[in-house]
Design a protein with these regions (language model features):
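Extended, highly charged alpha-helical segments
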Residues: 1-36, 98, 133-135, 139
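ABC ATP-binding cassette signature C-motif
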Residues: 29, 35-214
Length: 214
């Protein structure tokens, strides 16, 4: 009787193990990033003239730069040299110390911030609904799931998610807005391997312009 009971217990455990594996596979959706694209921009994305960036003190010498439609440019370098400050100065989020930036015509920019602090009691669903009020709940859930978020993540408050999961919520907004230029500040920083690979593929396929900090 003991052997039979033990065999039954082992049989039940095997079934449970199988169920666990199936459930885990189901609850790890593979991300699919397909950026919605706007009409083509003008020839120039931006031009800077003797731009000096910084806050209290200069972080750069005067920079005269330009970026044309279709270019994909990566800004590389050690932390703290001013890559994010340059990006924010170009888009007008912070004022330069001196010099000027001229933005091109017909720009539909999409900006991905490296870090964003979430403090409000807002679920992922509500966060996307704020951005896309015409979406149905099904469309909101579907958009978030395509970014690799599980049902549990989607129904959670954004502030309790991990850095990688919060990044996927921000990517969801970016992907579903029509853009022709992407300004990305270390977008792969907190992402898992699958999401990193999919984002690389999507950025290669993107027909617009890209300025990327990595």
């Amino acid at each position: 009787a003991r052997v039979a009971t033990r065999n039954m217990a082992m049989s039940r455990q095997k079934k449970l193990d199988k169920m666990d594996v199936i459930e885990l596979a189901k609850e790890k959706p593979k991300p699919e990033f397909n950026f919605k694209e706007a009409r083509a921009s003008g020839r120039y994305i931006f031009q800077t003239e003797d731009l000096v960036i910084g806050y209290d003190k200069p972080l750069s010498r005067p920079l005269t730069l330009s970026m044309e439609r279709g270019q994909k440019i990566a800004l590389v370098g050690a932390n703290g040299i001013g890559k994010t400050t340059l990006l924010k100065s170009i888009i007008g989020e912070i004022p330069p110390i001196s010099g000027k930036t001229t933005l091109g015509d017909y720009l539909y920019p999409g900006y991905f911030e490296q870090e964003k602090k979430y403090t409000d009691n807002v679920t992922c669903i509500d966060e996307i609904w704020k951005e896309f009020p015409s979406y149905t709940q099904y469309e909101v859930r579907s958009a978030l799931a395509k970014c690799g978020l599980t049902t549990k993540h989607i129904e959670s408050m954004v502030k309790v998610l991990s850095g990688g999961e919060q990044a996927k919520v921000r990517l969801c907004k970016l992907i579903n807005n029509e853009t022709n230029v992407l300004l990305l500040d270390e977008p792969t920083n907190h992402l898992d391997v699958d999401a990193k690979e999919e984002l690389k593929r999507a950025l290669k396929a993107y027909k617009g312009s890209i300025l990327l900090i990595c």
